[in-house]
Amino acid sequence: MALQIIAYVVALIMVVGACFSLLAAVGLVRFPDLYTRMHAASKAGTVGSGLLLFAAGLHSLDAAVFVRALAGFVFFVLTAPISAHLLAKAAHQAGYRMSKRSVIDQLPHKEEARRH
Amino acid sequence: MTPAAVLSAASGVALVLLSLALLLTVLRIIRGPTLPDRVLGLDMLVAIAIGLIAVIAVRTGFYLYIDIAIALGLVGFLATVAFARFILARGLSPERRTPGTTEIPQAKPRPSQAGRRKRKGAR
C-alpha cells in the first residue's frame, strides 16, 4: 500500500515538475525583455527540474540515491540564482536596456554613475 | 490502474511536456535578439535537460543518471558564469553601438542615421 502511494506521489510530482518547466519555457518566449525572461527561467525552471530530480530520488526507494538527488536539487537551487544574478548584472552593466514597458530601473548605468 | 501503469503514463506525459519546453527554449535561442537572451536560453536548456534526465532515470530504473544530472548542472553553472564574464568584458555588440560616440542608443536596434552622419562629419 505504501509503495502504491509513493508511486502515485512520484507520478504527480513528475507531471507538476514538467508543467513548471514548460511554463518557464513559455515565459522565456513570451516575456518582452531579458530581465523579465530571467524571472521565468531562474524561478520556474529551477523548481521544475528540482521537482523532477526529487521524484527520481523518491522513486528509487534507496537512501543513497535519494540523498544524491536531494544534493543535486540543493546544488541547483543554490547556483541558479547566482548565475541569473551574475548574467543580469553583466547585461545591465554592458548597457542592455529594459523594455519600454518597465516602470523603474534603480541601478544606475555606468555612464550615469560616472556623471554624478 | 496499477501503480506501474500510472507511473509509465505520467513519465510519458512529462517527457512530452519537457520536449515542448525544449523546443520553445530553442526557439528563443534562435530568435533571441541579443547575446544575453541566448545565454539565458542555454541556461534554461541545461535545466530542462536535467529534468529530462531525471524522468528517464525514473522510466528506465538506472539511477546512475542522477549523477550525470548533477555533473550537467555543474557544467551549466560554470558555462553561464563564463558567458556572464564575457558579456561584461565585451559590452554591447558592435552593431548596436554607434561608432565614434560614447552614447549608448536608447533601445534602438540599429545605429541611427544621425549618428552615422555625425561620424562622417567628424572625419
Curated annotation (Swiss-Prot), chain A:
Pfam family, one: PhaG_MnhG_YufB
Taxonomic placement: Bacteria, Pseudomonadati, Pseudomonadota, Alphaproteobacteria, Hyphomicrobiales
Official protein name in the record: UPF0091 protein R00998
Annotated GO MF terms: sodium:proton antiporter activity
Stated family: Belongs to the UPF0091 family.
Superkingdom of the source species: Bacteria
Curated annotation (Swiss-Prot), chain B:
Keyword Nucleotide-binding (UniProt): no
Transport listed as a keyword: yes
Keywords attached to this entry: Cell membrane, Membrane, Transmembrane, Transmembrane helix, Transport
GO molecular function term, any single one: sodium:proton antiporter activity
Location in or out of the cell: Cell membrane
Residues annotated as transmembrane: 4-24, 38-58, 64-84
Topology of the protein relative to the lipid bilayer: Multi-pass membrane protein
GO cellular-component term (any): plasma membrane
NCBIfam families: PRK12599.1-4 (NF009245)
Family note: Belongs to the CPA3 antiporters (TC 2.A.63) subunit F family.
Protein name (Swiss-Prot/TrEMBL): PhaF2 protein
Native organism taxonomy: Bacteria, Pseudomonadati, Pseudomonadota, Alphaproteobacteria, Hyphomicrobiales
Gene responsible for this protein: phaF2
